[in-house]
Swiss-Prot record:
GO molecular function, a single term: RNA helicase activity
Upper classification of the organism: Bacteria, Pseudomonadati, Campylobacterota, Epsilonproteobacteria, Campylobacterales
Protein name (database record): DEAD-box ATP-dependent RNA helicase RhpA
Span of domain Helicase ATP-binding: 51-220
Described purpose of this protein according to its UniProt entry: DEAD-box RNA helicase probably involved in RNA degradation. Unwinds dsRNA in both 5'- and 3'-directions. Background RNA-dependent ATPase activity is stimulated about 5-fold by RNaseJ (rnj). Stimulates the dsRNase activity of RNase J.
Species of the source: Helicobacter pylori (strain B128)
Amino acid sequence: MELNQPPLPTEIDDDAYHKPSFNDLGLKESVLKSVYEAGFTSPSPIQEKAIPAVLQGRDVIAQAQTGTGKTAAFALPIINNLKNNHTIEALVITPTRELAMQISDEIFKLGKHTRTKTVCVYGGQSVKKQCEFIKKNPQVMIATPGRLLDHLKNERIHKFVPKVVVLDESDEMLDMGFLDDIEEIFDYLPSEAQILLFSATMPEPIKRLADKILENPIKIHIAPSNITNTDITQRFYVINEHERAEAIMRLLDTQAPKKSIVFTRTKKEADELHQFLASKNYKSTALHGDMDQRDRRASIMAFKKNDADVLVATDVASRGLDISGVSHVFNYHLPLNTESYIHRIGRTGRAGKKGMAITLVTPLEYKELLRMQKEIDSEIELFEIPTINENQIIKTLHDAKVSEGIISLYEQLTEIFEPSQLVLKLLSLQFETSKIGLNQQEIDAIQNPKEKTPKPSHKKTPQHERARSFKKGQHRDRHPKTNHHSKKPKRR
């Protein structure tokens, strides 16, 4: 491999060096042409640090959050160094089929002018069809662990000596129970392969895996504080548990997002919320792990093509999705941890565009949100759920259907009230019952628990959102199996 970059240090933090352009990174003209045609202007921090290291043939361990441009960080140097020798030269292992397809699309796009051929291997697709694709001599294979291991055990992949192996979203593979599969897969791989490990977090099992499979790696760390950038406005709303679905509907009405993702904790919850929104005539679709492959792909395509503008999804199913134009992210519940929160809100505010991240919390989740806010070192603003405004009431009245029972009730009420008086009373009642979430006095009581809790206010709240800012807190050795390759020595 030709080395056209100066020697690199063994550790690179996100404050090192000035920011170069893609032209400074050592990429070929044909690759640069695809980069600029794809709309890239300058490298992200992870791309700036990783691309030269990969081009030099060094093993890399990189810690960076989802949404930082990791795919291009390993894809561009891989594409740059392909030899087109009719073998699988690079292997990318990733936790989910959606992410595998996303990476395959990205490599195809970035390899446009080098005619890069890829194959995507994942569960839920015909084994026979995958074998047919593999026989067409792709240069890059993108695979999920389970299906890849199945192909290797059954000796369905020939000419399999990848020079570069990428582990993407390594911590997610750990969470999904794939670590044993990963270690077994490495028994089939050439010991001299260049290994690139990418992970949002570095739990101990991932560190131990890195010690086993990486040789004198370049270490790259992009601080999480770079993720919660100023392009993403972060808000939260305090609600009662039973108000979640109504709160999402109200916020969709008042925020009017162009395209939004609503994250739920469970598959059942995703289905229920999607069905609720669809019943209210929202263009909604769902995405979760219990859906079959055809339905999952249909949901993603509907969202990409704007046939649906609300995607209700679980964390795992949406991992790695890179869909442009997402203006809003909603957390139906407070995420279970900071990593999940950062991953979720990273779906918006991309490529220099503005985004909005909104989280619904109950009074019981309030303290956990404050803890999370300190960890991400970013301000999250508190807002009240807006009340229904005049335009919404007019639209509701316009769309309402009048039944015979309502006509009968109207006749009874007009015997008691004048028609004009009746309308005023019904409108007043509508405004009173339209309130969702805690009002300002109730929220103040949560913020200052030592003070006497005021009685809930029944006065009409203003018909606009009132912001209240929160202050931030003070605050390889490998043992190769015999496949169709000869035995390989341990990597030291």
